[in-house]
């Protein structure tokens, strides 16, 4: 059994690969609660001896995870972005700057697409929102990073004197502060996604397929679906986002299968 570990800014997501089969349901814990990881490891049969993962939560967090795994007799290899792997090339100028989770997620997306696929835009709504594009030639073209919905909301609370920690409906013309904040956050997320969708249409001459992931998707879904209908209409398409549950773990599983 090979463990698959996605150590994100807020959440620790875990899966496994055994004889080509995946976990029936991934595990997820607060990334500060490493005791939950230790307890989960005790439930696994057979006990894993190897793990691969990506870590964007800092060196100390990676070392702490490795130490817990070592107590169970399991070693881990933290994966780093490569210029080319499993048929996917990487246009990032400096590989060391690219978040390993973004790279693994794009690889997970790549492995589910047929040859000759349209451009694909993957939007991940987590602590940060990332909007990354895979071309028909299987090149990761690059993408955007911006604060996720929760971080945007917190920034308004901590960076201003009077704005509340707001939740509310999204409307075209908000007339109440909670609505104004909720709508502004959704509009920022949707606008960034629409920009990258249009950039893909411009670069590749065909409309990108849209894939989404992350815990923030539910909050921004209505505004994104509405805006995608508007930007797609001039091209005769109505993009419908496809939800991916674990694109990072999917990419790690592909790498593990190739080891």
Curated annotation (Swiss-Prot):
One of its GO terms (biological process) is coenzyme A biosynthetic process. One of its GO terms (molecular function) is ATP binding. Its EC number is 2.7.1.33. Its cofactor is NH4(+); K(+). It catalyses: (R)-pantothenate + ATP = (R)-4'-phosphopantothenate + ADP + H(+). NCBIfam families: PRK13328.1-5. This is Type III pantothenate kinase.
């Amino acid at each position: 059994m090979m463990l698959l570990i996605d150590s994100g800014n807020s959440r620790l997501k875990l899966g496994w690969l055994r004889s080509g089969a995946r976990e029936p349901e991934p595990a997820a814990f607060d990334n500060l609660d490493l005791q939950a990881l230790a307890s989960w490891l005790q439930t696994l049969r057979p006990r894993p001896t190897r793990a691969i993962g990506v870590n964007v939560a800092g060196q100390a967090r990676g070392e702490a995870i490795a130490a817990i795994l070592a107590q169970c007799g399991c070693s881990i290899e933290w994966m780093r972005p490569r210029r080319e792997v499993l048929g996917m090339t990487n246009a990032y100028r400096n590989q060391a700057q690219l978040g390993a989770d973004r790279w693994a997620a794009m690889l997970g997306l790549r492995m589910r697409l047929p040859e000759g696929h349209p451009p694909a835009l993957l939007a991940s709504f987590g602590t940060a929102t990332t909007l990354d594009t895979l071309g028909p030639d299987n090149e990761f073209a690059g993408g955007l990073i911006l604060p996720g919905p929760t971080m945007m909301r917190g920034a308004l609370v901590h960076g201003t004197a009077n704005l509340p920690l707001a939740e509310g409906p999204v409307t075209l013309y908000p007339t109440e502060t909670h609505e104004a904040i909720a709508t502004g956050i959704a509009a920022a997320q949707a606008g960034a996604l629409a920009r990258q969708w249009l950039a893909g249409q411009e670069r590749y001459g065909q409309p990108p397929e849209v894939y989404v992931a992350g815990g923030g998707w539910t909050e921004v879904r209505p505004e994104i679906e509405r805006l995608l209908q508007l930007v797609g209409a001039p091209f005769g398409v109505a993009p419908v986002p496809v939800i991916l549950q674990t694109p990072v773990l999917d990419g790690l599983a592909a790498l593990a299968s190739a080891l």
